[in-house]
Amino acid sequence: MHVYFRGPVDFGLINIDIQPVPCVRNTDSERYKELIIKDIISVSSNGAHLCLSGLRLHVNCGYVAALNGFTSDGEYFRDNIFVVNLRNMAGDSGGPIFYYKKFTYVSLNGILQGGLDDFDDDINDITGVTTISSILNVFEEP
């Protein structure tokens, strides 16, 4: 099974025969190279401290700036996003957005959509995050 969507929610799924461990890559840490995902929690307040594990920048953190956001590039309209003030680079898209619970445990909050340009086409550490609930709702059984 290969499934992908570009709109209204941008994500992809691949069914393979392995037993994955739900974890976040944290390779810059000598002690905690994997952070185990314990649960999925929706972000419910501005100012919440969240982190990203990206391929290029690895783990870095910021604060929620806006809930219930949307973005459009003129071709695609995407809602069900929230905005976090944290830096990301090309290649970090698709990385998990998470909240630290304990040293090796995290809560999954979203998936990085990418940097969002402002009116002057500057990113300025503005990051769009796809909500986990919007992804899960696509596959929810009636």
Map each language-model feature to its residues.
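Short beta-strand segments that buttress and anchor functional surface loops
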Residues: 50-52, 83-86
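Residue-level marker for beta-strand->alpha-helix junctions and adjacent short loops that shape enzyme
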Residues: 57, 104, 116-118
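Catalytic nucleophile loop of clan PA
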Residues: 87-111
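Active-site or metal-binding loop neighborhoods of secreted/extracellular toxin and effector enzymes
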Residues: 115-117, 121-142
